[in-house]
């Protein structure tokens, strides 16, 4: 908290010098290691500093918080988030993304954002599919409950068997290992061909040489 306070004080001083404002950007769930952004602590700093908060909650939407509303809901600070970015590509298994915020901001982005101006609209089948998946997330909390049963079983099982999974607090389950590209290739082939497990693996240069992260993300459709 102290380091964030110092950073915000520095940003505030710079903003005053430049006659601008401060925008704090963070993730709800960090997609590589599964740990959560300290949204409750960041929102609490609004009492002492003037800033807007943008949260990229690509991995939290649909999995975290009441009814899958996301990481801000998980921390109980939804009203403290000014701009929320989410994607249809994770929990909703589609394509596209969306931004939530004040109407004036949404309209500003709609008519000025290059990626919006020079891109085609989503195909109607994808839009209808996204609406249906959103309906399922809203009306079937048992899917989220089942997901978390599987997440806890997977993560507890990995830890009990001596695997290092770090400090994840989300369905994103990293398994930290040592090795290079040959070991990574052999591992993912063995998992897929001999155990029926398909998952991605992270290697250098995304992480330091000699380290591997087996990135396992369970779904509500998996079985125990």
Model-derived regions, located:
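Short beta-strand
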Residues: 22, 85, 119-120, 164-169
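Short, small-residue-enriched loops and turns at beta-alpha junctions
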Residues: 5-6, 29-33, 60-63, 116-117, ...
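Conserved active-site segment immediately N-terminal to the catalytic lysine
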Residues: 50, 70-88, 107-111
């Amino acid at each position: 908290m102290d380091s964030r306070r110092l950073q915000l004080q520095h940003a505030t001083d710079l903003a005053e010098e430049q006659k601008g404002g401060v925008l704090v950007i963070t993730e709800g769930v960090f997609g590589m290691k599964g740990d959560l952004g300290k949204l409750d602590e960041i929102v609490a700093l609004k009492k002492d500093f003037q800033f807007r908060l943008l949260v990229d909650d690509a991995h939290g939407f649909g999995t975290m918080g009441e009814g899958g509303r996301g990481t801000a809901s998980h921390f109980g600070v939804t009203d403290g988030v000014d701009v929320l970015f989410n994607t249809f590509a994770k929990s909703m298994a589609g394509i596209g993304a969306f931004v939530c915020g004040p109407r004036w901001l949404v309209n500003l982005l709609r008519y000025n954002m290059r990626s919006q101006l020079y891109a085609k609209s989503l195909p109607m089948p994808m839009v209808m599919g996204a609406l249906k998946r959103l309906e399922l997330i809203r009306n079937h909390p048992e899917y989220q409950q089942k997901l978390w049963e599987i997440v806890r079983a997977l993560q507890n099982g990995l830890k009990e068997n001596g695997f290092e999974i770090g400090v994840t607090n989300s369905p994103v389950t990293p398994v930290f290992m040592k090795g290079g590209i040959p070991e990574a290739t052999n591992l993912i082939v063995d998992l897929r061909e001999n155990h029926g497990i398909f998952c991605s693996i992270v290697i250098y240069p995304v992480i330091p040489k000699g380290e591997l992260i087996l990135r396992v993300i369970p779904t509500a459709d998996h079985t125990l």
